[in-house]
């Protein structure tokens, strides 16, 4: 039977042992397909233990001398080829025993995941998969059970993406350099749902922000009158960067 002093001694010993962390980066890479109103996330099938043959988020251990962001970009570049993207650090996940390779009986090696989320356009992203692993796009509403705690990381990233769209201009990081207002609206509709705002109110609010430049060029894309092409004005946005904004 353990006495109070024995328990206190064990707790004291554990406090003296520092965890040896291996730091990894896991990417939640979203792609938006406005043509068919779909949002995908990139998954890879694991070919090694633990969780062999399970789907997981693309990830890597951070190399010596490599920054976290560099590791995130490296992982992304190994999986897809894309010109325009948005990438942001998401959150750190480091609960004990989140990885089965940790020893459950002592404070030994721990696995810390610093997660990032990225947004790309589906039609602009090409899977290149330089490894032997299977990589595929999965619709966000049809995700299989993921390895480790990647379900938790994915849900966190999905919520961050939806919130971020409402107060920051991340959509313009993934759109072409010149775009119509309807293309912006369709991107928002695809991610936030068609009922988030009607087009006229969205258009009015976006133009009032004063961060778009009319190029003076009109294009015909589908039925209806030719639409104006706009560009994102990064200089006009600078004074607004730290102010609360609502894009919808």
Where are these regions (language model features)?
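Short helix-coil junctions and helix-kink-helix linkers
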Residues: 187-196
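Charge-enriched amphipathic alpha-helical scaffolds
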Residues: 195-213
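NUDIX/MutT-family hydrolases
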Residues: 115-119, 126-161, 174-182, 204-206, ...
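Long, intrinsically disordered, low-complexity Ser/Thr/Pro-rich regulatory/activation regions
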Residues: 214-248
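Active-site segment of metal-dependent pyrophosphate-handling enzymes
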Residues: 21-23, 40, 70-73, 77-126, ...
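Active-site-proximal cofactor/substrate-binding loop regions of enzyme domains
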Residues: 49, 56-77
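N-terminal strand-loop-strand
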Residues: 15-55
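Acidic, metal-coordinating catalytic segment for phosphate/diphosphate chemistry
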Residues: 1-26, 103
């Amino acid at each position: 039977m353990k006495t109070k002093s024995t328990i206190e001694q064990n707790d004291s010993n554990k406090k003296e042992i520092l965890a040896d962390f291996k730091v990894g980066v896991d990417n939640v890479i979203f792609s938006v397909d406005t043509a068919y109103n779909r949002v995908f996330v990139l998954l890879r099938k694991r070919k090694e233990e633990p969780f062999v043959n399970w789907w997981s988020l693309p990830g890597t251990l951070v190399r010596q001398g490599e920054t976290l962001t560099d590791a995130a970009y490296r992982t992304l570049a190994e999986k897809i080829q894309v010109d325009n993207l948005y990438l942001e650090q998401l959150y750190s996940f480091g609960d004990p025993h989140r990885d089965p390779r940790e020893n459950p009986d002592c404070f030994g090696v721990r696995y810390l995941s610093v997660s990032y989320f990225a947004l790309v356009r589906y039609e602009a992203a090409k899977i290149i998969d330089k490894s032997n692993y299977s990589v595929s796009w999965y619709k966000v509403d049809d995700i299989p059970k993921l390895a480790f705690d990647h379900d938790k990381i994915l849900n966190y990233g999905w919520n961050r993406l939806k919130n971020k769209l409402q107060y920051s201009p991340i959509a313009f990081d993934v759109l072409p350099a010149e775009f119509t207002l309807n293309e912006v609206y369709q991107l928002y509709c695809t991610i936030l749902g068609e009922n988030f705002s009607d087009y006229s109110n969205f258009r009015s609010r976006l133009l009032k922000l004063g961060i778009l430049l009319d190029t003076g060029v009109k294009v015909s894309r589908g039925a209806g009158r030719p639409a104006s092409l706009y560009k994102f004005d990064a200089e006009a946005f600078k004074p607004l960067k730290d102010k609360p904004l609502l894009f919808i």
